Amino acid sequence: MQPGGDMSALLAQAQQMQQKLLETQQQLANAQVHGQGGGGLVEVVVKGSGEVVSVAIDPKVVDPGDIETLQDLIVGAMADASKQVTKLAQERLGALTSAMRPTAPPPTPPTYMAGT
């Protein structure tokens, strides 16, 4: 075994994991999720970075005398999209970070002394 061989392998593995993490973060930032409010009457599309891509509003909810309902539906759709981004991040990053966690070493068996 070469001196530092294990350390070199660990360093290379850490660099690979860091690269995968950066790639996953970039994918998440560009991923698009859909959020809905009012059972689909308002839909927003948001990137993982938080950028709002689009808002679609069903004409049925456009009532000049009741702007508050429309505002509530938009807020609900945005909140739903935010939850979708969080869920997507947990799914993608969770798998990656679980692969990075070190496994616990096996427990050492108890030692017995003769005559005790």
Curated annotation (Swiss-Prot):
Homodimer. InterPro entries: YbaB-like_sf, YbaB/EbfC. Its main location: cytoplasm. Binds to DNA and alters its conformation. May be involved in regulation of gene expression, nucleoid organization and DNA protection. It is found in: Cytoplasm, Nucleoid. It holds the Pfam family YbaB_DNA_bd. Belongs to the YbaB/EbfC family. NCBIfam families: DNA_YbaB_EbfC. It comes from Mycobacterium leprae (strain TN). It comes from the Bacteria. This is Nucleoid-associated protein ML2330. Residues 96-116 are annotated as: Disordered.
